[in-house]
Curated annotation (Swiss-Prot):
<comment type="function">
    <text>Required for rescue of stalled ribosomes mediated by trans-translation. Binds to transfer-messenger RNA (tmRNA), required for stable association of tmRNA with ribosomes. tmRNA and SmpB together mimic tRNA shape, replacing the anticodon stem-loop with SmpB. tmRNA is encoded by the ssrA gene; the 2 termini fold to resemble tRNA(Ala) and it encodes a 'tag peptide', a short internal open reading frame. During trans-translation Ala-aminoacylated tmRNA acts like a tRNA, entering the A-site of stalled ribosomes, displacing the stalled mRNA.</text>
</comment>
<dbReference type="GO" id="GO:0005829">
    <property type="term" value="C:cytosol"/>
</dbReference>
<protein>
    <recommendedName>
        <fullName>SsrA-binding protein</fullName>
    </recommendedName>
</protein>
<dbReference type="GO" id="GO:0003723">
    <property type="term" value="F:RNA binding"/>
</dbReference>
<keyword id="KW-0963">Cytoplasm</keyword>
<keyword id="KW-0694">RNA-binding</keyword>
<dbReference type="InterPro" id="IPR020081">
    <property type="entry name" value="SsrA-bd_prot_CS"/>
</dbReference>
<dbReference type="InterPro" id="IPR023620">
    <property type="entry name" value="SmpB"/>
</dbReference>
<dbReference type="GO" id="GO:0070929">
    <property type="term" value="P:trans-translation"/>
</dbReference>
<dbReference type="InterPro" id="IPR000037">
    <property type="entry name" value="SsrA-bd_prot"/>
</dbReference>
<comment type="similarity">
    <text>Belongs to the SmpB family.</text>
</comment>
<dbReference type="Pfam" id="PF01668">
    <property type="entry name" value="SmpB"/>
</dbReference>
Length: 158
């Protein structure tokens, strides 16, 4: 019997989300894709910038995630690149997410799409939007940490 490997390969990452939002918690969800969509995902032709997820009628959907049409299939057998895609979660997870998102200022943001074994997964972040001054504080903190690292490196060399 063949051994099972759960090799994880990140296909697309939403770096802007970590800059624009304060991520409270992350959750893994499956995603329902058609044949040409999964082929495009495996080829890495996914863009998550500006995408978001919503809970509608006890189901979670991913909106504005661009999965490019598959090159090798004809123009008639391809998918709509921006169609809403259903995310697969357990009922209790959906209810919990629905409760968290109803809180003021909370939203569901896809952080990355990756392949886990043969299946495509989405990492969702339960996030709160950052204010402009929060973003500036983060940048200043990163710059200060970088300066400290440089100073320590210089001191070690001497």
């Amino acid at each position: 019997m063949a051994t099972k490997t759960n090799h994880i390969a990140v296909v697309a990452e939403n770096r802007k989300a970590r800059h624009d939002y304060d991520i409270e918690e992350t959750i893994e969800a499956g995603i329902v894709l058609s044949g040409s969509e999964i082929k495009s995902v495996r080829a890495g032709r996914v863009n998550l910038r500006g995408s978001f997820a919503r809970v509608i009628d006890d189901e979670v959907f991913l909106y504005d995630a661009h999965i490019a049409p598959y090159e090798q299939s004809g123009k008639y057998f391809n998918h709509d690149p921006l169609r809403p895609r259903k995310l697969l979660l357990h009922r209790r997870e959906i209810n919990r997410l629905n409760g968290l998102v109803r809180m003021k200022g909370m939203t569901l943001v896809p952080l990355k799409i990756y392949l886990k074994g043969r299946r495509a997964k989405v990492e969702l972040g339960i996030a709160r939007g950052k204010k402009i001054y929060d973003k500036r504080e983060d940048i200043a903190r990163r710059d200060a940490e970088r300066d400290i690292e440089r100073a320590l490196k210089r001191r070690i060399r001497e």
